[in-house]
Amino acid sequence: GWNAPEYEQMGLWPGETFYASRYEFASEYLSILNDLWTTGRSDRKSQFWNLNDCYCLPMPDYPIPIVSAGQSPAGVEFCDQHADQRLVIGQPKVLDQLELRQKSGSLRKYQTYILLHMIVEKTDEKAKQVGEEIIRKADKVAIANMISSAQLDSNKGGSSEGVKISLDRPLEEGNSAFTAIPVIHGSPATVAMKLDAMAEKTGADGFMFSWNDFEVGIRAFGQEVLPRLTCV
């Protein structure tokens, strides 16, 4: 990841070069895992690793799927090479990229899942009001810390760039109060309509959601939104 303070507090941050090399690090790590999963041992020597007769038993009976987040050019390339499922934050520019990729007819190895924050209320107006109230009450100190960390990332075009945006962004575009995750909001019918349109536009294989209150949110989605979806 790019959030250096999370690693520095435990003495685990490798240094500034890791911003640019983290996908190479991850690729080598996956190569080691594949050695262990397919042969049970690894002696792999590489830029980041120096293994000597390492074992991992028992070996899996079937291929283990690789799930990876990837939005920057380097992240997308990593997914192209290694991932079975790719996770993306559903910001408008990302949705446009997915649409272009779908229209191009290019083959892809992995499935794509879009991350959104969901607010479902009885009316569209109430749902928007709830979202805007969260922005008004946002923890500005925490957001400032998050932005300062994101600004250090030298890997351009990834999720850290989305984090740098301000509290002035519309809910749908990924406001900092929601850690740059776009909010899909409205009545059950409106939310279902938006999800169907997004699925058709992007060809996404699925969605991931976060909620203000996950118990209430999951119940509302399952009982009121899911039955209205045509994309499932």
What function would you assign to each model-found segment?
Residues Y29, G75, C79, V191-M198, ...:
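Alpha-helical packing segments of well-folded alpha/beta enzyme cores
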Residues N3-Y7, G11-Y62, Q91-T202, T230-V232:
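An alpha-helical appendage that flanks or caps ligand/catalytic pockets
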Residues S72, E77-R86, P92-Q97:
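Long hydrophobic segments that form regular secondary structure
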Residues W37, G70-Q71, G90, W211:
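Residues that line or immediately flank small-molecule/substrate-binding pockets and catalytic motifs
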Residues I165, L195-A197, D205-G222, P227:
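Substrate-recognition/cap regions that form aromatic- and gly/pro-loop-enriched pockets
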Residues D80-Q85, S176-I181, A204-W211:
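Glycine- and acidic
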Residues L33, I66, C79, A127, ...:
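Conserved, mostly hydrophobic/aromatic
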Residues I66-A69, D84-V88, Y110-H117, D205-F209:
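Hydrophobic faces of well-ordered beta-strands that scaffold small-molecule active sites
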